Regions:
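Extended active-site neighborhood of metal-dependent phosphoesterases/phosphodiesterases
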Residues: 226-229, 307-458, 541, 554
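Active-site environment of divalent metal-dependent phosphoester hydrolases
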Residues: 250-253, 298-300, 327-335, 440-443, ...
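Active-site-proximal segments of metal-dependent phosphoesterases and phosphodiesterases across multiple
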Residues: 439-452, 458, 465-515
Length: 592
């Protein structure tokens, strides 16, 4: 083909940089998002995610008062024995019927905490931390950085606690606690009273949570430090693990990635090369596991997951691969429109999780088990759980028709399956615990924030507590500590944070000597230690790491030793570069 030489269609154009702050212009990205933002859907989402749970939380005091008055009313003027029996019946009904109501109220309360309070706390904390780090007298050592950040957390927590108390006191002094009889008032009056009560409850809970975080910082011992390798030859590894992360697989041969745009690689050539390198390394010295810590795909589309599965179709090491989901796998609403808002009940959220669950099933469903929430013991295999009678049919209906029943079932399944556990076999020195650290997001600006749910933390504690003295590799997407360097941007600290990271650390650190945490997300090449817990942060296998290696993909081969009682340690890891000058498919073809 010949024609006027204008540009090469294979090498992208301006449209490939629409969602990239690096390949395009950040100001243009913000303006585009604001113009394409659906304010009607956002308003509906605000009512659903914030206002409705707040009403549910705030109406509890009024319902309690109304029910108490009802019980007292039926008892007055009656025979004492009849009154006692009536009160007993009403109390029994309150316990029987009120339990689901209380459960729903608590669910709404915690939803507000994770949707509103925790992100506000993280933002306040990181703003204060960044101010502290920018003060004269530059923080040079790891200890100084940790001390400055701890001070920033304490100040931020105290400020937020003061704000929460001030908000609650202001509402109480201005309006009083709204205890009304819900039988005799109009719905608007009840709603207004519930919202005012919710503000008081949230203000006080914010103060309590903030003071708790302050206390935890004051009580904490040990800083985040860079890891020091063992002297060469001191120990012999008994396990070799390939740690890849953030593959960002695209669904098009010449497709670019959202974050990098045309500055990054196109197509899936780098992923294919990384897998070939892993295979060559295994042929030289056998690998025990191949771990991928999230962002397997670039936007969680069906085509991207299909590409991933095609890459592994005949891959000899497929049965050694384990992965966890990242925010790009489950939280990208629209890869071409950063202003699009996703309603809580939309099919999109459920479908992205269904695709991820399907890939988990196909790759590791015959060895990963879910945790029984009641006993804390290991339950059925993932493949058996997903295939239980009726469940597979509902999920198939979701995939084919986007049914409401299928959406509800998928959300229940997602809450149920994590953490996944690949228990150590008798001959294995360690097992895997796979966490989902992605907060449920409805908009591009919040898609990268992380949360490990309370139910997951409870199950994680149970597995670590009930397991024999074996070592565990704990996989998640988000970082559990901030890196001990002062140059991290405020947007990264807030927008990429695991908002309840202290809770995750608290669950793991009692077993720190036999745990190794592996994660990705931040595209940073770092290995460290926090309170005796080993932490491995992986660069992106396609987009590299921050600094000189940006867009130069790489991964690690970790050499692990396991001692008595499951104590785990690392030997100097091997860093493998994926980047090559011609890493895109089609470079050998003449330009169009």
């Amino acid at each position: 083909m010949t024609g006027t030489r204008i540009f090469d269609l294979r090498r992208g154009d301006y449209d490939d940089n629409r969602t990239s702050p690096h390949g395009g212009n950040i100001r243009s990205l913000i303006v585009t998002a604001a113009l394409e933002f659906n304010y009607l859907k956002a308003s509906i989402g605000f009512v659903t995610l914030i206002v409705a749970p707040a009403i549910f939380v705030g109406i509890v005091p009024s319902l309690v008062v109304t029910y108490s008055r009802l019980k007292l009313g039926v008892a007055v003027g009656r025979n004492p024995m009849v009154a006692v029996l009536t009160l007993a019946v009403l109390a029994g009904l309150a316990i029987l019927l009120g339990r689901p109501f209380v459960s729903k109220a608590l669910e709404s309360f915690w939803r507000l905490q994770y949707t509103l309070v925790f992100p506000i706390f993280v933002a306040a904390r990181e703003v204060v931390r960044s101010i502290v780090e920018s003060l004269p007298g530059k923080l040079a050592t790891v200890e100084e950085i940790d001390r400055g950040r701890r001070f920033g957390t304490i100040i931020g927590g105290l400020l937020l606690a003061g704000g929460g108390i001030g908000l609650a006191v202001t509402v109480v002094l201005s309006y009083g606690l709204q205890l009304i009889n819900v039988e005799r008032v109009q719905p608007w009056v009840v709603t207004r009273a519930a919202l005012l009560n919710a503000v008081v409850i949230l203000g006080l809970s914010t103060a309590v949570e903030s003071l708790y975080w302050v206390w935890r910082e004051l009580a904490a011992r040990g800083s985040v430090e860079d890891w020091a390798p063992l002297p060469s030859g001191q120990e012999t590894p008994i396990a070799r693990v390939a740690h890849l992360s953030d593959l960002h697989i695209v669904g098009e041969r010449y497709g670019y990635r959202m974050e990098a745009g045309t500055r990054g690689p196109r197509g899936n050539g780098p992923v294919r090369k990384a897998l070939q390198q892993v295979l060559a390394i295994d042929e030289s010295t056998a690998l025990d596991r191949i771990i991928v810590t999230g962002d397997v795909t670039d936007a969680g589309t069906r085509a991207e997951w299909a590409e991933f599965l095609d890459l592994l179709q005949d891959y000899p090491l497929r049965d050694r691969i384990s992965f966890v989901p990242g925010n790009h796998d489950v939280n990208i609403v629209d890869r071409n429109n950063p202003g699009r808002f996703d309603l809580p009940w939309s099919a999109g959220q459920a479908l992205r999780r269904l695709r991820t669950a399907r890939a988990l099933d196909l790759i590791q469903g015959d060895r990963a088990r879910i945790v029984d929430r009641d006993s804390g013991n290991l339950g059925p295999l993932l493949k058996d759980y997903l295939g239980e009678s009726g469940r597979a049919d509902l999920l198939r209906e979701l995939a084919e028709d986007g049914t409401n029943a299928g959406r509800r079932e998928m959300m229940k399944v997602w809450e149920r399956i994590f953490p996944l556990v690949e228990a150590p076999k008798r001959s294995d020195p360690y097992g895997l615990i796979l966490l989902d650290s992605n907060a449920r997001s409805h908009f591009a600006l919040t898609n990268a924030i992380g949360v490990v749910s309370p139910s997951q933390l409870k199950a994680l504690k149970a597995v670590l507590r009930n397991s024999p003295p074996r070592a565990w590799l704990i996989l998640l997407h988000h970082a559990v500590v901030e890196y001990p360097v002062p140059s991290i941007s405020l947007t990264d600290r807030i927008g990429l944070a695991l908002v309840n990271a202290p809770d995750v650390l608290k669950a793991i650190t009692p077993h720190a000597s036999r745990c190794l945490v592996l994660h990705g997300h931040r595209h940073r090449d770092w290995i460290g230690v926090s309170r005796g817990l080993l932490l491995c942060s992986a660069p992106s296998a396609t987009l590299g790491s921050h600094g000189a290696d940006q867009y130069r993909g790489s991964f690690y081969i970790h050499k692990i030793t396991v001692g008595a009682g499951g104590s785990i340690s690392l030997i100097t890891p091997e860093r493998v570069s994926v980047f090559e000058a011609a890493d895109s498919i089609g470079d050998e073809v003449p330009p169009l």
